[in-house]
Amino acid sequence: GQIEATNRQRLFTPLDVEPGLVAVDAELDGDALIVAFSDGHRCRLPVAALIQRLGWVADPEAPPAPIAWEPGAAPFPTVSWTAIAGGLNEPGVAEATVDFLGDFARHGFVIIRDTPTTEGTVAEVANHIGYVAGNNFGWVFDVRNEPKPTDLAYTAIELKPHTDQPYRKVQPGLQLLHCLANEAEGGDSVLVDGLAATEAMRREQPDLHEALATIEVDFRYDMGTDVAIDRRPVVQLDSAGRFRQLRFNTKLDFPVPADGADLDAWYAGRRWLAAWMDDPAHQAAFRLGRGDLMFMDNHRVLHARTAFDPTSGHRHLQGCYIEHDGPDTR
């Protein structure tokens, strides 16, 4: 055969295929299509797999489609860590995991309750779902008020809705933030759906949406010895024009040179998005409790934080990132 039996990978290369190869005959054989090629090769293709590959029916193993949400009309997806922490062969764990990952695919976030409150738990949860991805902030980072912060997250000031690290060529895919302590006054959490925001913009201000989807921007992080720069549009679409990814962080974006009209449209679009996301009607606002963990899609859901008083109590979160491959393949 031309396919390795164990790993299902091809054993031939493009150089093994004759130029001008064509299918010369095809016939149904039960639930398969037998195709004969001009070089004498014959292959057996399951009809169900062909129909699925052509997109005529939905892939039963594909994650649920994303659903744009606003707080007033959407559920607030949560799951208990105890329900999903075990092996998939344990009673109830597979079903709870399917529900958890389905909620995450639809809404772009889930709050995981009842996790252990020890340092490093965030990595344990992350490695249960996928694999921790390290960067210049380490494998696991601490979010607390620091005297010399390497990021505004490590201060007590308000943080507006944003996605993390848009300056990376591969922007971190999924973020986990685990609450170890939240005793200070303030410091409430906010989530905003970037899919809902960009869909609203496309409906109401299509020219501004076009500007943010086509004009590339320099995203930059510069700590002297640690510099990262990437150039991308704020809104990234797929080949069919559907939402794929949002890079929105007004602390770190630097527009590239553009003519007056394009630049005006870009700035107007940036302001429109910022205003939409800053509207409490579009924000899911809540307070993380000790043992709560926010699991969110950094390509879609923006997170924010109200200011807090570090003298009024201790506030300490730990965070890390994983990639989409983890939950997508489960």
Protein language model annotation of sequence segments:
Residues 36-41, 247-251:
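Secondary-structure transition/turn motif
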Residues 24-28, 235-236:
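Short, exposed beta-strand/loop patches in secreted or surface proteins that constitute
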Residues 1-5, 28-38:
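N-terminal alpha-helical targeting/anchoring segments
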Residues 1-24, 48-70:
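A low-complexity, Ser/Thr/Gly/Pro-enriched, surface-exposed linker/loop concept
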Residues 31-37, 43-50:
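Short, structured motif recognition centered on aromatic/hydrophobic residues
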Residues 62-109, 114-330:
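Active-site environment of non-heme Fe oxygenases that use a 2-His-1-carboxylate facial triad
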Residues 41-45, 117-120:
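Short, surface-exposed beta-strand/loop "edge" segments at domain boundaries and coil↔beta transitions
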